[in-house]
């Protein structure tokens, strides 16, 4: 087991005059195993972003723990957490968000490897990765604004795969891409997972994507994980009323 999320809760207080406590996550528990894809679905405001921030230790939960390889991430020092982040990384919905607009594509691809001391045989490994991801070498001298959405997402993948992560948190990674490019990226993710046994935590509102990618699926509603199980069961034979309505509404579109 790579990731073991146990009873995570988080609330925020809102309002200036009348303080109101809002529970954003309530008793969230799940596991993620080597080489598997766990999909998490939910509408806007379900708590997906807060969950991601807690998993990446950018936000402290009110209760519960996140264990990575059996170690409580909340108890790690900054240096220890840096080592964890080399093996647990994130792909953003908007790939440009991870790339500095004034850095060339080569500089952006090199950045994580330099940060985590993974520059051994870098040029050779980068060329292999460019070929694998179908990225033209001529793009290396360009800047993010000059690339298409599909090219940017491939760059985002390349820079992280060069540091050999064990877990990738994928936050709506194809939602900003057209259908043909989306299919290419999803196929690429599946191939990379088969080769490297990377574990994916795949966050998406698109149930078709989760059906294609995930072995297990969890449904997040108003901060609660109301249903989790095999993708076939959750998406085609849902038990919880919220999941039933979500599935019915999505596939009726």
What is the role of each PLM region?
Residues 17-19, 73-89, 115, 234-238:
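ABC ATPase NBD coupling module
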Residues 41-43:
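The feature captures the beta-strand-to-loop junction immediately N-terminal to the Walker
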Residues 56:
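Helix-to-loop junction immediately C-terminal to a conserved catalytic motif
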Residues 64-72:
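Conserved ABC transporter NBD signature motif
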Residues 121-138, 247-248:
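Conserved ABC ATPase "signature" region
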Residues 143-147, 151:
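Conserved ABC ATPase signature
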């Amino acid at each position: 087991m790579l990731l073991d999320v146990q009873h995570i809760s988080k609330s925020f207080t809102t309002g200036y005059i009348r303080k109101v406590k809002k529970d954003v996550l309530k008793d969230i528990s799940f596991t993620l195993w080597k080489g598997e894809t766990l999909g998490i679905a939910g509408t806007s405001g379900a708590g997906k972003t807060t969950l991601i921030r807690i998993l990446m230790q950018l936000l402290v939960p009110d209760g519960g723990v996140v264990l990575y390889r059996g170690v409580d991430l909340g108890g790690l020092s900054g240096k220890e957490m840096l080592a964890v982040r080399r093996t647990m990384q994130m792909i953003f919905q908007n790939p440009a968000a991870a790339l500095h607009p004034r850095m060339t594509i080569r500089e952006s691809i090199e950045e994580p490897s330099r940060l985590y001391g993974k520059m051994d045989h870098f040029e050779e490994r980068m060329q292999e990765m460019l070929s694998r991801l179908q990225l033209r070498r001529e793009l290396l001298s360009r800047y993010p604004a000059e690339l298409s959405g599909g090219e940017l997402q491939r760059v985002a993948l390349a820079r992280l795969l060069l540091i050999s992560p064990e877990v990738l948190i994928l936050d709506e990674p194809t939602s900003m891409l057209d259908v043909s490019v989306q299919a290419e990226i999803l196929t690429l993710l599946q191939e990379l997972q088969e080769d490297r046994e990377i574990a994916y935590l795949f966050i998406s509102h698109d149930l078709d994507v989760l059906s294609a990618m995930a072995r297990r699926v969890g449904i997040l509603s108003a901060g609660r994980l109301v249903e989790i199980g095999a993708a076939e069961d959750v998406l085609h034979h849902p038990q919880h009323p919220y999941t039933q309505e979500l599935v019915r509404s999505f596939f009726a579109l």
